[in-house]
């Protein structure tokens, strides 16, 4: 049984560029390694898993598993434990990347990783928090509990989409991070998800502490994607929580 599997959380608010950055890391992974990606989506119908698997094509050395329907440690907590166990004990990868939903609570994800069930099998490394510097102009983002928790538990802040930002926005992000988290938290700009593997292999500085309470999310425990399509050939699913709402459609390829 493999022990000390390196695991990184790649977090960030909605639209920060998490999936693009994970694809960049996968492109740079060693050819002889198997990686597992655990994707969590706020909506009942997963999009990020489809984006990752679609980009990878028929790639047997990357396993992508999904926990849909809300924060993986809230309503989907049981599903996360089952899926993480499957990754550790069946897949036994060389590395695990976890992408929580942009409305998720990564501190609770980290608490799960430190549970007795998993901790001897995992080597918990840096948490990468991705922030689009332009989002600092949006008060509904900067005041959101999920955004603040993502920043507070960061080991490294990635300023995404710098090609779309001006110098003042990049500087404002660095000053904002320093004022909230201190000057020791590094902030680096990365374009088009071009992350280096060197950003991963640093132990996390995270320590268990009081967390921001999660807002209950309306979500069925049963994964929507597993429901059979009716004769009409499509399903519609809705989910809401933390002030956001999603609507997803799943349509048969035959329709």
Language-model segments: which ranges?
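Short histidine/acidic/glycine/proline-rich micro-motifs that form metal-
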Residues: 136, 163-164
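A broadly conserved amphipathic alpha-helix scaffold signal in soluble, globular proteins
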Residues: 107, 111-114, 155, 175-178
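Nucleotide-state-sensitive switch-loop elements of NTP-binding domains
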Residues: 2-11, 16, 20-140, 145
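Flexible, charged surface loops at secondary-structure boundaries
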Residues: 30-31, 151-152, 255
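Short glycine-centered, acidic/aromatic-flanked micro-motifs in structured strand/loop junctions
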Residues: 12, 100, 160-161, 251
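Conserved beta-strand/loop subsegment of P-loop NTPase cores
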Residues: 36-37, 96-97, 122-131, 151-163, ...
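Active-site glycine-rich loop that binds ribose-phosphate moieties when present
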Residues: 138, 142-147, 160, 171-173
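C-terminal accessory "lid"/substrate-recognition subdomains
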Residues: 149, 165-255
